[in-house]
Structure formats: C-alpha cells, structure tokens
Amino acid sequence: ISLSPDWTARGEGVPVPEKWAISIGDYTVNEYIGQSHEAQRLFEPGSYSLVVYNPADGITVEGTTATVSASSEAGQDAFISGSPAWFFTAVQDVTIEKDREYLFSVVMKQQIRRLTLIVEPTGKTADLIEGIEGSLSGVAGKIDFATGSHSSPSEVKLDFTKISEGADAGKWMTSVLLLGIADDKQQLSVNMRFIKGSALRPIAIDSDLSAPLAGFNTDKPHPLV
C-alpha cells in the first residue's frame, strides 16, 4: 500500500505541512516527511480504516479525536488556544485484496478556520480608547474528524489591536484560528478601556454572534470576517 496526500483543498496562504501521520489498521507512522509513503509491511485481505493527519502545534490527536490545547498565556487557563497550527485530516475506508498493489490518493481536509472580528467604535470618546480585550464562547475544543462532529464548547481569549491605516483605520481588529463552533450560542464579550486621565470608566459590551457564525464549521479554507 502506498499513500499520497492531496493538500490542494486549503486556504490561500496556508502552507503545506512538512510532516504527516498515517494509520492503517494497526500500522502507524507518527511522523513522515515526503510526498508519498509506501507501507513497510504487507496487509491481509480485508477492510481497513485509513487515517491521515498532520501533527500540529497546539493540537493533540487520539484516534480520530483532535483536541485544542489550553492557552499558554499566563492566567488564561480557562481559555483554549486561539492560535493552533494549521491542521488537516483524512479518513477513508479501503478494501484490500490478495496479491494486489494499491496507491491511494487521500484528499486532506482543512480543519482550522480563521475568524477575524472587527469592532468599530463611534462617538466623541472613540479616540480615547486605550485597549479592547474580550472573549468568544461556544467555540469547539474538540472534533471527531471521522464524523465531522464538533464538541467540548470552550472559550477563546481575544486581544484587539487598533487599525492605523487604510479604509478601516480607527477600527479595532482581532484574528483567531478555530476548529469550529460547538454550541447553539456564540457570545462575544468585550471590555473597552480608556486612556488614563480621561475619567471614563471601562465599558463592557456583549454581542450574540450565533447567527453570523452558524455556518462556521463549513468551508473552512475560506476565512470569515
């Protein structure tokens, strides 16, 4: 049996992983570098589940379940990472017959999607904002990539930066990389801080993003803004 992963179904600017892992029945290779792999053994005739994925920083894999690591930033243990590495998977059922050679081309599915959120402050106090931080709840901490099921609703930390150039100058933006969403509700909670000496108290804002994020788990190669 030989395998050749097809990485073409990935987003613009997303690199092809250098390493990939293989599982065919009880035959496993944890890290392989190359465009194709020939299994170093013969297989008895029968049906097998072929599993391929790339080892990715910030993601652990057990069987066909991938889990996002907790945030590595100090004091943020309650959050999952918003910056795992790009992660691709493939699961395929194959049938092996006696005295035959096989070359399987496996289409790799991108499992991480970029989400960009933009806050547009208005009014006389917009220029007095010093910083915006927040969180997004209802994001997926796990995925079973054999079934496509997203689970373990979690929260990701958001740190916004002010856009200084272009048509969006004056707005605040943050981007995170997510496995998907895993709950009926996605709640954005942000806190606006104002510069010292302004006598303005921080403002807390909550926004329900469930509707705009309803289809987030599909079309992952395309970023969502």
Specify the residue positions occupied by each region the protein language model found.
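Extracellular and analogous surface-interaction loops
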Residues: 42, 94, 105-111
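Structured interaction patches on ligand/partner-binding surfaces of diverse proteins
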Residues: 57-103, 197-225
